[in-house]
Regions:
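Negatively charged, low-complexity tracts enriched in Asp/Glu with abundant Ser/Thr
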Residues: 1-39
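Generic structural signal for bulky hydrophobic/aromatic residues embedded
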Residues: 19, 49-50, 95
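A generic structural signal for solvent-exposed, polar alpha-helical segments
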Residues: 9, 27, 39, 51, ...
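Intrinsically disordered, low-complexity regulatory segments enriched in Ser/Thr/Pro
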Residues: 50-81
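A conserved amphipathic terminal alpha-helix motif
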Residues: 73-104
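Short, surface-exposed coil-to-beta transition loops
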Residues: 41-46
Length: 104
């Protein structure tokens, strides 16, 4: 699932940590984060984030279990725009979207 948050006002890694994600690594400007849903580490949300100006581009999926097939490219993940992924996307958007300025 992919979406974008516009006009972020804080560091992307800080925002995602606040949302419960743990930084894993950065590769060519793309950061990898995970948020386990169980103490064993799986299932977990696996998120890739990249900044473009003031915008944060997010791509994530749900890993159901660890890779069990060596160097194969198959993946035990869910990518649909419904169910648990949609709920997590909505949760992330509510946390990451900057609040509009207030007039006093």
């Amino acid at each position: 699932m992919k979406f974008q948050i516009n006009n972020i006002t804080e560091n992307a890694a800080t925002l995602l940590r606040r949302a419960g994600y743990t930084f894993q690594y950065e590769d060519h400007g793309e950061m990898s984060f995970v948020r386990p849903l169980a103490t064993a580490g799986y299932p977990r949300y696996h998120l890739y984030a990249k900044t473009s100006g003031l915008n944060l581009e997010i791509s994530f999926h749900l890993d159901q279990k660890a890779h069990t097939y060596g160097n194969e490219t198959r993946h035990h993940g869910e990518y649909e725009n419904e169910g648990a992924l949609k709920q997590e996307a909505d949760r992330l958007k509510s946390i990451l979207t900057p609040l509009p300025p207030t007039d006093y």
